[in-house]
From Swiss-Prot:
Annotated membrane topology: Lipid-anchor
Name listed for the protein in its UniProt record: Membrane-bound lytic murein transglycosylase C
Entry keyword set: Cell outer membrane, Cell wall biogenesis/degradation, Lipoprotein, Lyase, Membrane, Palmitate, Signal
Covalently lipidated residues, kind S-diacylglycerol cysteine: C17
Coiled-coil portions: none
UniProt keyword annotation of DNA repair present: no
An annotated Gene Ontology molecular function: peptidoglycan lytic transglycosylase activity
Cleavable signal peptide: 1-16
Keyword Nucleotide-binding in record: no
GO CC, alphabetical: cell outer membrane
Length: 360
């Protein structure tokens, strides 16, 4: 569903999300400073959009939504990786179809390097790639995939002639074109990362199906994934919590950079390393592997401490309580009694996705 976030809603959301220590429970002053700075940046960014597009038309990139503004924030491209749809829109007062045409072509031909694109500015930094990220995920009006600029241009012209729509936001007219992704777009994106997933699986001893399920739930295999908590990349790793924990376990100082976490291979490696830490260190006292897997999944979203506190404030006693339960009872408790509604839903989503990957 399209994420239309008004600025009044965004501000408290940013504060609450950024104060969470999701995917790790490390807390330090640097993390607070970085997060507060990110909140300010996001507030200013949302304000710029609201001033031009209107209160109900604020649209910002998220874990499963690529949103890029250009033309002094007058044109935007939105890929909804959940719904499988691309929407290109403009409020340009002069030659709106020219603005749409250019944005359609660049969106269809953009590469898969998130480090080259700033989603929080209107800088037109989208580079046309010989290996477009959306290749095979979009077919033109003749049923062909789009790799070259000539085919993308022809398709853009076709779309502007046959699918151009307009609506008013109270400030100006919004012109838009929507393109559907192919039905199996999720599988096509997942296929890009299978090799990296297998490598990380062997390296850390984490089941491939779990890694894929986490990626699907976190980002829908969107390498450009960002969040209001500043979680980054395919597995939505936060630099100053899970990222720092993994670096420390590997004998590295500091935290992974944004560019590091936007690199798909590095992101998958770091996210998988953190899953291994949860399984082998933080939650190792849970004896039944299925019960421990449920705990690991929930902890990847909300932290190991919050999982154990569902059962007892004492970590050892919590593990002992879990060990006396059946895996089904552990699942039931985590999906109904965890204090975070997001974490309760998360276990259900990841577990369901993992079952589907195991059947393949």
């Amino acid at each position: 569903m399209k994420k239309l976030l008004a600025l009044a809603v965004i501000a408290p959301l940013l504060i609450s999300c950024s104060s969470s220590t999701k995917k790790g429970e490390t807390y330090n002053e640097a993390w607070v400073k970085d997060t507060n700075g990110f909140d300010i940046l996001m507030g200013q960014f949302a304000n710029n959009i609201e001033n031009l597009w209107g209160y109900k038309e604020v649209l910002i990139a998220g874990p499963k939504d690529y949103v890029k503004y250009t033309d002094q924030f007058q044109t935007r491209s939105h890929i909804n990786f959940d719904d499988g749809a691309i929407t290109v829109e403009t409020i340009a007062g002069t030659e709106p179809t020219a603005h749409l045409r250019r944005a359609i072509i660049k969106t269809l031909l953009m590469g898969d390097d998130p480090t080259s694109v700033d989603l929080y500015s209107d800088v037109d930094d989208i580079k046309i790639s010989k290996e477009p990220f959306l290749y095979g995920q979009v077919l033109d009006n003749t049923g062909q995939p789009i790799r070259w600029e000539g085919r993308a241009t022809t398709f853009a012209d076709y779309l502007l002639k046959t699918r151009l729509k307009s609506r008013s936001n109270g400030l100006s007219i919004i012109y838009s074109v929507t393109i559907n992704l192919v039905p199996n777009h999720l599988d096509k994106r997942a296929h890009k990362y299978i090799g990296m997933v297998r490598q990380a699986s062997r390296k850390y001893g984490v089941d491939e199906s779990l890694i894929l399920a986490i990626m699907q739930t976190e980002s829908s295999f969107n390498p450009y994934a960002v969040s209001h908590a500043d979680a980054l990349g395919l597995m939505q790793v936060v630099q100053h919590s899970a990222g720092k924990d993994v670096f420390r376990s590997q004998g590295k100082s500091g935290t992974p950079s944004r560019n590091f976490l936007f690199d798909p291979a590095s992101n998958i490696d770091t996210g998988t390393a953190y899953l291994a830490m949860l399984n082998n260190v933080y939650l190792s006292g849970i004896e039944n592997p299925t019960s421990r897997r449920y705990a690991v999944i929930t902890a990847y979203n909300g932290g190991a401490g919050s999982v154990l506190r569902v059962f007892s404030n004492d970590k050892i006693q919590a593990a002992n309580m879990i060990n006396r339960m059946s895996p089904g009872d552990v699942y039931q408790i985590l999906t109904t009694r965890h204090p975070s509604a997001e974490s309760r839903r998360y276990l259900y989503k990841v577990n369901s996705a993992q079952r589907s990957y195991r059947r393949r």
